[in-house]
Amino acid sequence: MGAKHIGFIMDGNGRWAVAHGMPRQEGYAHGLVALYKVAKRCSERGVEAVSVYALSTENLNRPQGELDSIFKVVEKFNLTYDGEYKISYMGDFNSLDDKLAYSIEQVEEKTRDNKGMWLNIAFNYGAKADILHAAKVAYDHGEFLDDTFEKHLSSSHLPPLDLIVRSGGEMRLSNFMLYEAAYAELMFLDKLWPDMDEGDVDKILDDFDKRVRKFGK
């Protein structure tokens, strides 16, 4: 059975920009172009959900100019998106600018009844914080068991995570969907995120289809 839910750690946007003689912050707009290509091909190949790591809570320590560029790209995407995907976000939005937080709310509402693939965006997100929040809610409701605990995670509306792909050459999960990754396959690519395209998706999915998943057995 093919992958139904893939997580992408979109690493390498800043390095790509520098390698092409641009300021680091310009890499994020090019990264969005790559995301459109990757998501489109995933949808064509029958993937039901794509989760992408757009901004970690730790990334908030980056220079303000770089953060402003990320916020601008995300806000523009939210305000202009008119495709078929169902857009969802997970993360802490309380510390975000009101206008950016509102754009997140708007795009989720606008696409709620769409029939396409889920495009789930982790933004100002950290898996450890998400797990702790889910544990607290589950405990408060007296239902701290696996099958009930999971419904309090930010990803509870999505299929189980099958595969995590990280671009950019690093080999770590960086606090991305740690609970959901328990039995997920992992793939690490040297290619920088803005260079990702449809052909890479085909290679990723073809590789996944050859793997034998044991789910801890």
Where are these regions (language model features)?
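Flexible, compositionally biased loop and terminal segments
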Residues: 1-217
